[in-house]
Amino acid sequence: MQELDSSNDEWVKELEGENEESKFTGRRLVKKSISVPELVDEVEEDLDDFTEPADDFNDKVGKKRQRKKKDESGLEKTKKNKKQNSEEVQEMWDSITNNTNSQYGDKVVVKPPKKKDEDAEEIKKLFSLRKKKSKCDKTSMEIGMQVEQVMANLEIAVEDDVICNREGKPAINKLMKLPLLNETLSKKPLQGEFLDHGVLNLLKNWLEPLPDGSLPNINIRSAVLMILNDFRIDLDQDSRREQLIKSGLGKVIMFLSKSDEETTPNRRLANDIINKWGRIIYNKSTRYDNMFTQEELDEQRQILLRRQTKTAPKVSGTRARDFNTDIDLYELGTWTGRARAKIPTTMSMDFKIRPPSKVDINQEEEPCSKWQMEKRHKNKQQKNIRKGGMQALKLSVDGRTMLKYL
């Protein structure tokens, strides 16, 4: 028994000595290698050699793979630590700046609602709530019934204004119905239907003066004239032409165009309406050449011929001989005793009497005097000197001869 104990003690000492040597050798290898980030003891490798291999491929290549896995696990740990540190720093910074939109941490991020999306949704709702227009067209009977109702309301307004005017009250019924008149008669598709129901008679009643002789409100007059100017009345048709003549609307518009109480814009508008209707009714063209009749053109031609063949006023013989002074036109013509301006007329330049000249050709020239001859001679000399170039004269000591610039 003592021998066994001693043998066991020796075996344990040998193992301890081998372990110490392996530790020293392992540490030396680790110090020499720079690529490995951490110190790895070879004791673990020796222990692995003693253990039974779990897989068939437990060779040197397998050991290298295991080392790589261990290195990768160490790098992952460092990355996790860095992430944790960065998250903590970010949380600290967010708590200081009161930033709720942090990407780290367990806080729930609440995004503010977008205004543009809300506005777009509200606009869509508004359009969706609108009622769609009925695609079914109204029949002619329904349109006729509506036109008759409008005409009846407008006629009642005219009758009420007449009654109010006779009683001395303000006539404001037509003024209240004016928006209805503008709205209905401004619609182009309904104008033909209104003409068939006699709207021209209604408009004449709206424009004509009240029983006391006063004109309707200026807003009513201007609105009705504007409607008539834009109204489609096909006067080429005989039925429409007769309808316009029988309604008496033209007489009322003519009265407004010549009335002093009417404003100038309304008078111009009334004149335009009359000219437009009159040319169509009386078949007058708008060309300037066709606006005059043949008789008027003949009269204009005769006037031009008279102006061309008009002779000069007759002059007495005694006055014609003495032509030294200007002739007074008032003395030649018939003097009425009124000094007024006359319209200038063209004068034909066909003269029969030539005025006598003031110069006598037969008169002999008198002999010139000496001073006249000298003066002429000096003038000639000066002209000759000016024509030629300037020459400098020689100076004398006495100063008798001087330079002359002529």
UniProtKB/Swiss-Prot annotation:
Disruption phenotype: No visible phenotype under normal growth conditions. The gene is IWS2. Gene3D superfamilies: Conserved domain common to transcription factors TFIIS, elongin A, CRSP70 (1.20.930.10). Its main location: nucleus. GO terms for biological process: brassinosteroid mediated signaling pathway; regulation of DNA-templated transcription elongation. Residues 41-56 have a biased composition (Acidic residues). This is Protein IWS1 homolog 2. Residues 201-284 form the TFIIS N-terminal domain. Belongs to the IWS1 family. It comes from Arabidopsis thaliana. The keyword Cell cycle does not apply. InterPro entries: IWS1/2 (IPR044204), TFIIS/LEDGF_dom_sf (IPR035441), TFIIS_N (IPR017923). It comes from the Eukaryota. Keywords: Nucleus, Transcription, Transcription regulation. Pfam families: Med26. Transmembrane segments: none annotated. Transcription factor involved in RNA polymerase II (RNAPII) transcription regulation. Involved in transcription elongation. May function at post-recruitment and elongation steps of transcription. The lineage of its organism: Eukaryota, Viridiplantae, Streptophyta, Embryophyta, Tracheophyta. It is found in: Nucleus. Residues 10-24, 69-78 have a biased composition (Basic and acidic residues).
